[in-house]
Amino acid sequence: MTQSILSNLNHPNDIKNLSYSDLKYLAHEIRQRIIEVLSVNGGHLASNLGVVELTLALHKVFESPDDKFIWDVSHQTYVHKLLTGRNDRFHEIRQFKGLCGFSHPKESIHDHFHAGHAGTALSLALGVAKNRDLTKRKDYIIPIIGDATLTCGLTLEALNNISRELKRFIVILNDNAMSISKNVGAITHILSRLLSNPTTNKIHQELDTIVSKIPNYGPILSQQGHKITESLKNLVSPAVYFEQYGLSYIGPIDGHDTKKLVDVLEGVKDSNWPVIIHVLTRKGEGMDEAIKNPISYHGAKPFSKDTGKFLPNPVTKPTFPKIFGSHLLKMAEKDPSIVAITPAMSAGSCLDDFMKTFPERCIDVGIAESHAITFAGGMAYGGKMKIVASIYATFLQRAFDNVFHDICLQELPVVFAIDRAGISGPDGSTHHGIYDISFLNAMPNMIIAQPRNGQVLKELMESAFSWKRPTAIRYPNLMTEEFNHPICERELGKGEVLIEGTEILIVALGHMNQAALKVRDLLAQTGIEATVLDPIFVKPLDSELFCKLLLNHNKIVTIEEHSVVSGMGSIINNFLVGQGFNQIQVLNLGIPEAFLDHGRNQDLLNEIGLVPEKIFRQIQSHFNLIAQNTLNPVA
């Protein structure tokens, strides 16, 4: 049995003297370690299996942390973590108080940014390189970007800002979808210069004119000549594309050949200009199931490490996104004016069936959130189409100005289906959807609503187009009750009293009503009968209902899985002041003004006090309540 190499690695320098046969065995060990841990924890599997040799080559050639690897999105840094002293904690990845699933500077000096959103690496790297040059340092800056990153406007802006004089700047294009031409060799470089040369183009045009005049065969020869030229252009397009930005293009290179990668990286270290190395990798390399289905194994759920098959999921209820996706499809089958738009999240947002059924009415614009929102505004212009922009809450942050300038200011009736609203568990602080109410509430004309269950979600979806205003319907990725009752029209801005009592009014947003009802039961055991109100609408608030309830309630508790800063609680506080309810005592509960870490949702909620027992205790403490009987319902 071969002795483990991985278990004896303490620093990335430890791999520099390994033979290529040892590196091959280490790559095998790394893949087995990733598969073993993620079979239990879940996580970004396919992309990490695909970058093993690339990461080994980078650490073999460069000196981390002095030389800086800046990973775009950084969900593919598991191998990097294993090589930089975190193997002993790798079993904790994405777990509460464990390793982050993305790069994180607080975790290691080898991680330079806490990333999680796409398209940022190149801009960050250029900034780091400028800092290096101004401070007269000589370290290498190596941004690692994916092929999908090239759809990001931010990446294109950064490309446009690259200087030809920039040295020790090496961009790695990790192409795991082979979406860019994979033709290779010196001929690519030669033809790129030849076909982009104005003189060559002029000669081609003149020859085409002469050939086309040949009797009988002229048009055929001319047509074939055009086909050959277009083929050659496709052959060389990567070089032509990147070199116009000042980057010297090399590749494509086999991303699973460690020696070839090392040779190329060593060869460009002394380049006098910025370089981009096009590396072809395969998502899921080393695991058959992940290779066959890289989308499902991108963010994999727990699976059998022996067979690779996903473990049975004892799901008894649908999730909010599944209800959204299936109901939107039903609506679209009845109404041909409904169009869905998504920025590269059709699978996560459960729009795949919609896309298969109505491909012309489900538009995936790629990782381009700003464009997605403004594009939605353009489609909504004129009022003949009903536009649903489906987007994760954390990614909507990237399109703040587009929502303001291109939707709300224009008074366009786009419906925002805001997925992953609330805590996003193992993905952590880069992905929690806990700020959208804060910035959307500042937008004039905007409607903000959140359903407590699948039935209310469907009713909001059915009603939203009739309001003819920008509308945000936010919901978490959690299981919920669907009910399938007849769908009633939702009146704009109207809430619902779930249980009526006196003295304490508990206002809970969306799925937090489940916790609110449990809190009410705990309060009831101490002699207090509270009212539970589901406002449904954060904007506009049901002012009539609030004013009525406040006649016999002198305490309000707001509960939301959102930042307490400018969230629902703040909105209600402003309402109370504006209406003159100055004697009302208020307790606002939500996510504190801090970056919330990663872990299971329940662990995170418990830590910040948003579970029923802790909410109950906070209510008792804040309002100085004295139990009216001796029952202590909480241990």
UniProtKB/Swiss-Prot annotation:
InterPro entries documented for this protein: Dxylulose-5-P_synthase (IPR005477), THDP-binding (IPR029061), Transketo_C/PFOR_II (IPR009014), Transketolase-like_Pyr-bd (IPR005475), Transketolase_C (IPR033248), Transketolase_CS (IPR049557)
Cofactor note: Binds 1 Mg(2+) ion per subunit. Binds 1 thiamine pyrophosphate per subunit.
GO annotation, biological process: 1-deoxy-D-xylulose 5-phosphate biosynthetic process; isopentenyl diphosphate biosynthetic process, methylerythritol 4-phosphate pathway; terpenoid biosynthetic process; thiamine biosynthetic process
Annotated positions binding Mg(2+): D147, N176
Family matches, as HAMAP family: DXP_synth
Listed name of the protein: 1-deoxy-D-xylulose-5-phosphate synthase
Alphabetized GO MF terms: 1-deoxy-D-xylulose-5-phosphate synthase activity; magnesium ion binding; thiamine pyrophosphate binding
EC annotation from Swiss-Prot or TrEMBL: 2.2.1.7
Keyword Metal-binding: yes
GO cellular component terms given for this protein: cytosol
Organism: Protochlamydia amoebophila (strain UWE25)
Subunit structure: Homodimer.
